[in-house]
Amino acid sequence: MAQPPDAAAAAAVPPPVVIDRDVWHACAVPYSGVLPGVGTLVYYIPHGHIEQCAEDPALLLSRLPDPIHPVPCTVADLVLDVDAESGEAYATISLLPGSHDDTTARRQVPAHGEPGFRFFEKQLSPADVTSNALVLPAGAEHVLPPLDIAAYQTARLFDVRDLRGKRFEFVHIWDKKRCRYMLGDLGVNDNDGWRGFVKAKRLATRDTVVFMRRGGGDGDGDGELLVGVRRAPRARGGHHPRPGVEDNKVVSEVWLAMQGVTPFEVTYYPREGTFEFVVSRDEYIGFSFSPFYPFVPGTTVHLRMNPLQIAQSISGTVRTFDHLRPWRMLEVDWDQAASPISYRIHRQVNSWQVLRQPQPAATTSAVRIRDAIVATPQVQIMALPRPPPPTTTTGMVPSDDSYAMISLFPGDCYVTHRPLPAARDPVGGQREFCFFDKKLSPSDAAANGGGSGALFVIPKPSAAEHVLPRIPDLRVTNLQGGRWEFGHTWSDADTDRRSSSHTLAAGWSAFVKAKRLCVGDTVIFMRRRPGGEPLVGVRRKPHGGMPVGIPDKHVADAWLDASSAQPFRVTYCPWQGTAEFVVRREEVEGSPPLAPGTRVRLLMNPDDARRRSQPPVYGTVRDVHCRSEWRMLEVDWDRDSPLAPTMNRRVNSWQVQPVQLALPPQGSDEEAAAATTSTAHAGDATTSAPSLALQLQTMASSSSSSAPIIPSRGSAFRIVNPRDGSQG
């Protein structure tokens, strides 16, 4: 009985092929194709998306606003499919702008296939494209239906489906004369076998065919045989045009992403010469901004491979690292002798695509057939090795570093202006908040270096007169509430108490060991008001004995919330060598343009009294990095300043002022003469309870580029991404 036309047409349509992650990774470029899970937090990088377009990426970038930053998103859906024209696998990723982290909703979609997945690949030579047979690489017989050579079976007919479901017939041949396996024709016409497959797929030299067996083992007829195609890069106008993403669609998707409101979809082709542009948040933040992964010239790196290509190892040496570029910021000289595909890898790669250490061994999983058919150790690249966590918490309790927690509202939504408690003039000739600091010498820190004891001698005794009471058993409290007891001695010179000397002996060695103080660290003694309890704090030198840092996740969370216009919180530590990254808006927008050769003066915090006694710091602008948003000025500081050796040459434009636009005088000459020296400071008076902001300014580094300027509640400001001197 004849079937109806519709039923016959439906029967002729091949059933679709389910593309799981194993098939996807086998068809993807070996160094690409990493897919995020549904529900994970990612960064969408428009530069990588634009790179897939057929037109010149630079021309398309000119149609978009500048600059274009990575956009934080959440993966809403992930669909794997095959291009109908080229046969290439691609992924459609649905993204939701902003942070919508739901750990319970995270899942691998689509999931991995059945155990026992095997595949081999072959890049076509000119002879493979023009001849009637394909010479198979070693190990192909473990994927294709096997031949019984002992029983003189030298040929076998089998069929295989492409990723669109279409069936092709091949002949598996054993060439006993040359001792090699081949894929041949049926000998009927030019449209069957290997020759027919080349014509149907319009294969060209340097294209790659991938044969896969999904499910089953090596037995006869076990599992499903599939064949995929990986196209080589081609010039525009060539004989085999490559399908791509429409330019207008890419532009609209970038605009939607930058608005941060409407969900959008992107299409990703894991082709040669391109990289994934939807990157996990942890990978992007950890490898682009983490201080544990500095890419200095000469560093040896290993290219990350997708999970099924881990048998290959490609290494290279870093030539340059441009942290200002959001895409392909790393230039690497690849070792072409180590891997046959090294010459096909672009020298410009992304920081999250390489690892500084060799890839460790792990469990055995899907096998990639190589020269030797053995169980290949595989590393799940999705589980990247993380840098060691810092020993300090957000509150910096182990290191005793002072910090500020600043709650921020994006935009101008918070208009109530509430300044912090201001300091008032001293009463009765004495200031209510007094302090002095001292940088530790080798003798001061001898207890931490293995010595039996140490003494803390105050070089200018007048500093301690209003801070340390004349008590033999001096009890001092640190900023975390811990109490310390020191043996305090002092000596008078005649009747002038300003010439007396103070020394801390007993208990000082235990304090040095407990705080792990090193030479160059600074100890600050403070007193809340005359007659109050003394306090002690620590200011660490750069890269001192205590590892300090803000976890990467805190920085990433703040970035995600800020990008989605949500309130967020940042932590600022006034360490030496860092600068405040929450800056008043009028300072950033009102900073004058500077040119190389301009004489500038470093701006100091006018509310910090200890700065008034220090001489101004002058310098000459050496270079201006216009594209940079952080530390865009390079300044040669005058060597006659005592702070010059500790100053960073790279500063921000709002941290300096041209000499021609001099600041108004900060107090009279008599006030400047009466100010205390750098080792004996008297802070501004506060209200009955001293402001924590004043304590933060006291704990700030005296040799930093500027004292910490804490924004008032409700003030408008800009938060700057500190890529050069990131605290996180």
Swiss-Prot record:
The keyword Chloroplast does not apply. One of its GO terms (cellular component) is nucleus. It comes from the Eukaryota. Residues 665-689, 700-712 have a biased composition (Low complexity). PROSITE patterns: B3. Residues 119-233 bind DNA. Pfam families: ARF_AD, B3. It is found in: Nucleus. GO terms for molecular function: DNA binding. GO terms for biological process: auxin-activated signaling pathway; regulation of DNA-templated transcription. Residues 665-728 are annotated as: Disordered. Keywords: Auxin signaling pathway, DNA-binding, Nucleus, Transcription, Transcription regulation. Auxin response factors (ARFs) are transcriptional factors that bind specifically to the DNA sequence 5'-TGTCTC-3' found in the auxin-responsive promoter elements (AuxREs). Belongs to the ARF family. Homo and heterodimers. This is Putative auxin response factor 20. It comes from Oryza sativa subsp. japonica (Rice). The gene is ARF20.
